[in-house]
């Protein structure tokens, strides 16, 4: 017969993941974390340039309210490649709750950075790019000081309460003595005047409160009508600017939304070189009349797909800058560098955007630019 050893509680212990070097981020969005976290969101401050690679581990959170489970915004914790709860995973190996990130030039081999010790405080993460509005740093709370703070607050409240009672009693006695003295003085003066023949027969009505006219209430100034937010517009009508940038309007750059370098993403149409790039963007009429348009039902919506191709001469002065913006978030290199890049095999695998291999333009006089635009209505 099997026996139970109550002294052995190892099976009942909850296994916690190794602590991260950094404070976690809170994902305050209805979107999945992998749709919000930029693919190059690696904290700065640890490791060399080869080790700027790792993953964000998603921590699902919930609480019970009236017997029902209520989901809370998830937190994400950063770990370098080869560390943390998923240290055995290879870079970009699929796993639930894992969002892979890396910087340009990082190597896809395990780092030697290890994990934070539990008695060390986590660092506040800092990044070389701006955090999307859906992400925020969760401040560290030292639980070891909670009891001392609670005791201090309790003592302060008790002292304040006793002091308040004592002060209140003293003020009450002072007011009572003052009122009694005033009454005695008024009675004595009145009696003296009466004995001298000054009997106040007619009392003038009190004018208290009537000598000072009340100022009419000024009407509140009407609030100035603010410019409508781009986020209130349909997605296909938004125009990103410095105030509401590309990430706010359309989300972070990824392989399905791959146009724009850091300047364009930050400033939108207010970026310095955007007017030149706009020369190679079809207008509404061209997109409508010169596209292959198709529709498809997606749940309660209709998906409208525009497939558009345009021929641009190779000597077009705006073409090099335009091509530079393609997947610029993964490989911010110039056109000349792309054209002069020689094919070679590196000894170590170096991360450099997993985009299709770039091919030279055709030998004819024009380049083909294909645009596929999908709109959910």
From Swiss-Prot:
Modified-residue entries (Phosphoserine), positions: 148
Positions of the CoV N CTD domain: 223-337
Region feature (Dimerization): 230-334
Positions of region (RNA-binding): 19-151
Keywords, alphabetical: ADP-ribosylation, Host Golgi apparatus, Phosphoprotein, Ribonucleoprotein, RNA-binding, Transcription, Transcription regulation, Viral nucleoprotein, Virion
Compartment(s) where it occurs, according to its Swiss-Prot or TrEMBL record: Virion; Host endoplasmic reticulum-Golgi intermediate compartment; Host Golgi apparatus
GO cellular component: host cell cytoplasm; host cell endoplasmic reticulum-Golgi intermediate compartment; host cell Golgi apparatus; ribonucleoprotein complex; viral nucleocapsid
Region feature (Disordered): 140-183, 196-244
Pfam families the record matches: CoV_nucleocap (PF00937)
Top-level taxonomic group: Viruses
Domain CoV N NTD, residue spans: 17-139
Family statement: Belongs to the alphacoronavirus nucleocapsid protein family.
Role: Packages the positive strand viral genome RNA into a helical ribonucleocapsid (RNP) and plays a fundamental role during virion assembly through its interactions with the viral genome and membrane protein M. Plays an important role in enhancing the efficiency of subgenomic viral RNA transcription as well as viral replication.
Subunit structure and binding partners: Homooligomer. Both monomeric and oligomeric forms interact with RNA. Interacts with protein M. Interacts with NSP3; this interaction serves to tether the genome to the newly translated replicase-transcriptase complex at a very early stage of infection.
Protein name, per record: Nucleoprotein
Organism listed in the record: Human coronavirus NL63 (HCoV-NL63)
């Amino acid at each position: 017969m099997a026996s139970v050893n109550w002294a052995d509680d190892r099976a009942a212990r909850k296994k916690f993941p190794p602590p991260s070097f950094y404070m976690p981020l809170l994902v305050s969005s209805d979107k999945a974390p992998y749709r919000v976290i930029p693919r190059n969101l690696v904290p700065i401050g640890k490791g060399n340039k080869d080790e700027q690679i790792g993953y964000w581990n998603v921590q699902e959170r919930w609480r019970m309210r009236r017997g029902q489970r209520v989901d809370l915004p998830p937190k994400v914790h950063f770990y370098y490649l080869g560390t943390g709860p998923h240290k055995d995973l290879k870079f970009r190996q699929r796993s639930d709750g894992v969002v892979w990130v890396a910087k340009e030039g990082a190597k896809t081999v395990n780092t030697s950075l290890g994990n934070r010790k539990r008695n060390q405080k986590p660092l506040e993460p800092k990044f070389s790019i701006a955090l999307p509005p859906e992400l925020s740093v969760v401040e560290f709370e030292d639980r070891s000081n909670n009891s001392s703070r609670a005791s201090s607050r309790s003592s302060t409240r008790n002292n304040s309460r006793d002091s308040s009672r004592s002060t209140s009693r003293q003020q009450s006695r002072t007011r009572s003595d003052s009122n009694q003295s005033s009454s005695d003085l008024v009675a004595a003066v009145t009696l003296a005047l009466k004995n001298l023949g000054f009997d106040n027969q007619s009392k003038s009505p009190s004018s208290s409160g009537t000598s000072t006219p009340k100022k009419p209430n000024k009407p509140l100034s009407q609030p100035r009508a603010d410019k409508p937010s781009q986020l209130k517009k349909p997605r296909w009508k938004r125009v990103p600017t410095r105030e509401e940038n590309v990430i706010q309007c359309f989300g972070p750059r990824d392989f399905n939304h791959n146009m724009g370098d850091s300047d364009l993403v930050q400033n939108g149409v207010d970026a310095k070189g955007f007017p030149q790039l706009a020369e190679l963007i079809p207008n509404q009429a061209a997109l409508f009349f010169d596209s292959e348009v198709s529709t498809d039902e997606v749940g309660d919506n209709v998906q409208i797909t525009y497939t558009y191709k345009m021929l641009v001469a190779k000597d077009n002065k705006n073409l090099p800058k335009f091509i530079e913006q393609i997947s610029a978030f993964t490989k911010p290199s110039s056109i000349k560098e792309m054209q002069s890049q020689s094919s070679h095999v590196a000894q170590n695998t170096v991360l450099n955007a997993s985009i299709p291999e770039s091919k030279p333009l055709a030998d004819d006089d024009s380049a083909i630019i294909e645009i596929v635009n999908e709109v959910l209505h």
